[in-house]
Amino acid sequence: MDFPIRSQARLYPAQCVTFCLYVRVPPLSEWNFLKMQTDARPSATWPSVPKVHKRNRSTSLSDQQTAKKAHANHARLHLPQPIEPVYESQNGSVSQSEEKSSAVEINNSAAGDPQRFAVADLNFSWAEEEEKVVLAPYDYVASNSGKEFRTLILNAFNAWFRVPPESLTIICDVVRMLHTSSLLIDDIQDNSLLRRGRPVAHSIYGVAQTINTGNYVYFLAAKELNKLRNAASALEVFTAEMLNLHRGQGQELYWRDTLKCPTEDEYLKMVSNKTGGLFRMAVKLMQAESPAGPMAPVCDKLVQLLGLVYQIADDYKNLTAVEYTTSKGFCEDLTEGKFSFPVVHSIQSRPEDRRLYQILAQKTTEVEVKKYAVSYIESTGSLEYTKQVVRVLVQRARDELSRIDQGRERNQEMHALLGKMALE
């Protein structure tokens, strides 16, 4: 049977609205049944407020509001109050009231006693698990290693330097750490999407964490140098070449962001600082650790040539090689807006034509637009010109290699590496 209950609600100062609230009052038989159930099972819940299973200790705001309204309505209508819902947790069943008091206790416990700071040991140690968190972006890239070309070059140079194995291992590790950590930063600065065929680290770990990790590993590498026999000299070399690396990177970013095309010589100087810096650092560290000491061969010119060949050949492959499309994306240098060696030559060949400027400014990801850019670069003879430059530099490096080797052809590893770098 339904009974209307009249009430008045004041909605506006000058207006009252009368409304009817209809409540269904159960028949006497149902009341007796419910009373028997609640007497027999005091833990039973009111039918309209079901028991909740597998909940966390913290209840949501909506659950608390619903429970309060249910209690208020039953009290106003003189109905039996529903049993407070019970929530199951890992520590057993708890009610909402117990939940609140427990939460207060937890908060008070978390706050703790301020006096503990008077005697507490505040000398914290760095845990291995914490180190893993900070190094996660680096480990992600390092786990997908590349060609290890720099390690091959160091092994080839060691035919002359004869660096002790333990020192050579440290130098190779330092070079690998610096190269990998620089990739973390480069990918952010270039807005890259892929690195070695996988999503770039900052797309997974975030930009801020990836930058922090890249910088952190720079200092870890410097710390490793303290293990070398000539640690003081090694740190001087490290500092000088890291400065050169950042100078070269700064130049390249400036040209890209201001859409200023460098001259060929400006480009070569940038490459000498950016790419050649890491090669020079490695070779100078090996010279410092070599048992030959001052009698060790001077390889500065060869290292310089290797850095130029490596970068210019890389620029060429980025626009032409299929494997680069798989690992980095199709013509990624064009998407980055980069003034690579073929692009610089193409623009200078036709300075009045602004088409390449416009394409670089857009940082386009459209494949057809990039295909058109490559065909334009090819039409200016820039791809063939780049191949010829690499060929000349490789031959010059071979001549320098023969000079260092004094015609004895001892360093066959270096000859083999130069053969791989040539664009034949």
From Swiss-Prot:
Gene Ontology biological process: alcohol biosynthetic process; farnesyl diphosphate biosynthetic process; geranyl diphosphate biosynthetic process; geranylgeranyl diphosphate biosynthetic process; mycotoxin biosynthetic process
UniProt lineage: Eukaryota, Fungi, Dikarya, Ascomycota, Pezizomycotina
Protein's name in the database: Geranylgeranyl pyrophosphate synthase D
- Binding of isopentenyl diphosphate occurs at K147, R150, H179, R196
* Any one cellular-component term (Gene Ontology): cytoplasm
Q: Main subcellular localization, coarse class?
A: cytoplasm
What does the similarity note say? Belongs to the FPP/GGPP synthase family.
Q: Name one Pfam family in it.
A: polyprenyl_synt
The note on cofactor binding and number reads: Binds 2 Mg(2+) ions per subunit.
Source organism per entry reads Phomopsis amygdali (Fusicoccum amygdali)
List the pathway annotation. Isoprenoid biosynthesis; farnesyl diphosphate biosynthesis; farnesyl diphosphate from geranyl diphosphate and isopentenyl diphosphate: step 1/1; Isoprenoid biosynthesis; geranyl diphosphate biosynthesis; geranyl diphosphate from dimethylallyl diphosphate and isopentenyl diphosphate: step 1/1; Isoprenoid biosynthesis; geranylgeranyl diphosphate biosynthesis; geranylgeranyl diphosphate from farnesyl diphosphate and isopentenyl diphosphate: step 1/1
Per its UniProt record, what Gene3D superfamilies does this chain match? Answer: Farnesyl Diphosphate Synthase (1.10.600.10)
Provide the reaction this enzyme catalyses.
isopentenyl diphosphate + dimethylallyl diphosphate = (2E)-geranyl diphosphate + diphosphate; isopentenyl diphosphate + (2E)-geranyl diphosphate = (2E,6E)-farnesyl diphosphate + diphosphate; isopentenyl diphosphate + (2E,6E)-farnesyl diphosphate = (2E,6E,10E)-geranylgeranyl diphosphate + diphosphate
What ranges does the record give for the region Disordered, renumbered to this chain? 42-73
